[in-house]
């Protein structure tokens, strides 16, 4: 990345933040992890290619630190927005090469419908995600962390987790086990963040429809049954 390129990237972000401030926004979700790659210097995953045109390419500055500083200058909170379970399609994963989590921590990754995903049913998945979260929360003056795609993929009935289900389900149905897997990741990360910095907010982006009601059908697209999220349960437990 050239000095001119760095300056342009920073100017574009500053322009966005100025517009948000003028519109009275008080919180910015800055994308920090995409699909197995990141937008800050990490010891765990490579830089996203959007910054330099090359996977793992150092942009010459720390985009997350810059974003946090500029948000705070404007009196706005900055939350690290992290995509969690999906790792991208086969082409994207191949572009990461040996730096991909699918190569480094194979046991927690599964291919499904031409894409790769972290496996919520593997106990080490929450540990891996917590390593990424810890890296961000410990190193940066972040105000919150926000989790996207913390769920099973669409059309998940055939998701390849039979081995883990047999090993870890302990008598639960497949639906309940999967739902518990997602809730355990939420719980584990929430408690981990609060143990490090109690003031850092933890939020998740669930599917907008919780489940069907007697009057309204979700037409097969809801949090509880389709992708195994239980946001009402999270709120009731106080882990959101």
Residue locations for each model-derived region?
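Aromatic-lined carbohydrate-binding/catalytic grooves of carbohydrate-active enzymes
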Residues: 23-59
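Aromatic- and acidic-residue-enriched segments that line the glycan-binding/catalytic groove
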Residues: 40-52, 86-113, 150-170, 215-222
């Amino acid at each position: 990345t050239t000095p001119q390129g760095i300056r342009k990237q920073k100017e574009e972000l500053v322009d966005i933040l100025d517009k948000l401030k003028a519109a009275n926004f008080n919180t910015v979700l800055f994308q920090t992890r995409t699909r197995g790659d990141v937008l800050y210097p990490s010891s765990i995953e490579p830089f996203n290619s959007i910054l330099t045109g090359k996977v793992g390419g150092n942009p010459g500055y720390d985009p997350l630190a810059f974003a946090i500083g500029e948000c705070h200058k404007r009196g706005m909170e900055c939350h690290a927005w992290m995509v969690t379970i999906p790792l991208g399609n086969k082409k994207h994963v191949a572009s990461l090469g040996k730096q991909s989590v699918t190569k480094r921590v194979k046991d927690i990754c599964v291919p499904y419908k031409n894409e790769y995903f972290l496996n919520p049913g593997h106990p080490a998945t929450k540990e891996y995600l917590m390593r990424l979260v810890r890296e961000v929360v410990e190193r940066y003056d972040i105000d919150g962390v926000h989790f996207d795609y913390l769920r099973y993929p669409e059309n998940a009935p055939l998701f390849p987790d039979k081995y883990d289900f047999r090993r870890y389900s302990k008598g639960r149905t497949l639906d309940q086990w999967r739902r518990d897997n997602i809730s355990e990741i939420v719980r584990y990360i929430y408690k981990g963040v609060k143990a490090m910095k109690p003031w850092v907010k933890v939020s998740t982006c669930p599917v907008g429809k919780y489940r069907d009601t007697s009057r309204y059908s979700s037409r097969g697209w809801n949090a509880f049954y389709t992708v195994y999220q239980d946001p009402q349960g999270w709120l009731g437990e106080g882990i959101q």
